[in-house]
């Protein structure tokens, strides 16, 4: 396995994990907001 650009792979990995983190925060924020506003 030849890795021509490991930096590009790290950037893609960080971007994907960032999107998953934002999605997780959004999913957790919906029931919490409903709980606080009710």
Swiss-Prot record:
Tree of life domain: Eukaryota
Question: How would you describe this protein's topology in the membrane?
Answer: Single-pass membrane protein
Q: Which UniProt keywords apply?
A: Chloroplast, Membrane, Photosynthesis, Photosystem II, Plastid, Reaction center, Thylakoid, Transmembrane, Transmembrane helix
* Database matches in InterPro entries: PSII_PsbL, PSII_PsbL_sf
**SUPFAM superfamilies, per this entry?**
Photosystem II reaction center protein L, PsbL
**Localization, UniProt:** Plastid, Chloroplast thylakoid membrane
Q: Name one Pfam family in it.
A: PsbL
Sequence intervals crossing the membrane: 17-37
Tell me which GO cellular component terms the UniProt record holds: chloroplast thylakoid membrane; photosystem II reaction center
Work out whether the entry's keyword set contains Metal-binding.
no
Biological process annotations from GO: photosynthesis
Q: What does this protein do?
A: One of the components of the core complex of photosystem II (PSII). PSII is a light-driven water:plastoquinone oxidoreductase that uses light energy to abstract electrons from H(2)O, generating O(2) and a proton gradient subsequently used for ATP formation. It consists of a core antenna complex that captures photons, and an electron transfer chain that converts photonic excitation into a charge separation. This subunit is found at the monomer-monomer interface and is required for correct PSII assembly and/or dimerization.
Q: Which family does it belong to?
A: Belongs to the PsbL family.
Q: How does it assemble?
A: PSII is composed of 1 copy each of membrane proteins PsbA, PsbB, PsbC, PsbD, PsbE, PsbF, PsbH, PsbI, PsbJ, PsbK, PsbL, PsbM, PsbT, PsbX, PsbY, PsbZ, Psb30/Ycf12, at least 3 peripheral proteins of the oxygen-evolving complex and a large number of cofactors. It forms dimeric complexes.
Q: What is this protein called?
A: Photosystem II reaction center protein L
Q: What is the lineage of its organism?
A: Eukaryota, Viridiplantae, Streptophyta, Embryophyta, Tracheophyta
């Amino acid at each position: 396995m030849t890795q021509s650009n490991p930096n590009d792979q790290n950037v893609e990995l960080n971007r994907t994990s960032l999107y998953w983190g934002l999605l997780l925060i959004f999913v957790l924020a919906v029931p919490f907001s409903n709980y606080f506003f009710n």
